[in-house]
Regions:
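Aromatic-rich, lipid-facing transmembrane alpha helices and their immediate juxtamembrane interface loops
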Residues: 15-19, 35, 57, 61-80, ...
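Active-site-proximal specificity loops/subdomain of glycosyltransferases
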Residues: 1-35
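GT-A fold catalytic core of metal-dependent nucleotide-sugar glycosyltransferases
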Residues: 27-66
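Short catalytic/ligand-binding loop motif for oxyanion handling, primarily in non-cytosolic enzymes
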Residues: 11-12, 45-49, 54-57, 122, ...
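Long, low-complexity C-terminal extensions of enzymes
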Residues: 14, 142-254
Length: 254
């Protein structure tokens, strides 16, 4: 385990930063980072051993390539603005008709749920010229540094602007632009994400605790719920569940 400071990979002009977008768009600059890497947020937990093929196959990042239109209903937050900006970058640099013709079997694939394949085919018929968005889970993302470099080469001013914002802004892009770039370019291996589960509130915590104790899924994300919850009670229940499978501290913990 290596401790990395923002000053190790961000330009001086961007420091200090309080923007996850600025950090995300420069993680490929972390000294010593491998070409193939997996990006986790701090609320994501593997709960059973996972093989390398859960993240990379034949050198390609594993991800879900099904098309899923961006939902812009109700209050629009920063992440929705970023998603629209990400999609604009992808559509500016990729011809959907050509990519679907070339990589169609990755966008509609038997590893996905049949309902998702039907939606993708419907979206391809309704919007043949432009990508409308892709399925996003709040889950670890497999990347190559080459993807980040390609996006920087394609949109240097946009990414510089995102990097220099001290706080997240509506005209930023985020790491999804690289994830979606991989999908649009066909540089990915189709992957079923049903073994990734997310969120924690009063209605889901019992199921999450059961999943942890039984280690029935690969990955768990204890995401922030949108509505107010009894945080202390939920945290205690989740902590007990985690301690049932991880009773001892790791060598990195005090």
């Amino acid at each position: 385990m290596s401790h990395v400071s923002h000053s190790d990979f961000l330009p001086k002009a961007a420091l200090p930063t309080f923007s996850s977008h600025a950090i995300e768009m420069n993680i490929h600059r972390i000294p010593g980072l491998a070409e193939h890497f997996v990006y986790f947020n701090d609320d994501m937990f593997p709960i059973r051993p996972m093989p390398e093929t859960a993240f990379f196959r034949d050198g390609q990042p594993c991800t879900c390539g099904e098309e899923h239109p961006i939902g812009l209903i109700g209050e629009i937050g920063i992440w929705q603005h970023a998603a629209v900006n990400d999609l604009g970058v992808v559509n500016a640099h990729f011809n959907k008709r050509k990519q679907v013709k070339k990589f169609g079997k990755k966008y509609v694939n038997r590893v996905y749920r049949w309902q998702d394949n039907i939606r993708t085919k419907a979206v391809e018929k309704l919007f043949p010229d432009y990508f409308t968005g892709f399925k996003n889970l709040h889950a670890p993302a497999a990347y190559t540094k080459s993807t980040f470099e390609a996006v920087w080469n394609a949109e240097p001013e946009l990414l510089k602007r995102t990097t220099l914002h001290r706080f997240r802004c509506a005209d930023d892009v985020n790491q999804w632009v690289c994830l979606w770039w991989q999908i649009a370019s066909g540089n990915f291996a189709p992957f079923n994400t049903d073994n990734f589960v997310s969120c924690a509130d009063e209605s889901t915590v019992d199921n999450l605790c059961r999943i942890i104790c039984e280690q029935s899924h690969d990955m768990l994300c204890v995401n922030d719920p949108e509505k107010a919850v009894d945080f202390d009670s939920l945290a205690l229940r989740l902590r007990k569940a985690f301690e049932s499978i991880l009773p001892n501290k790791s060598g990195f913990e005090k």
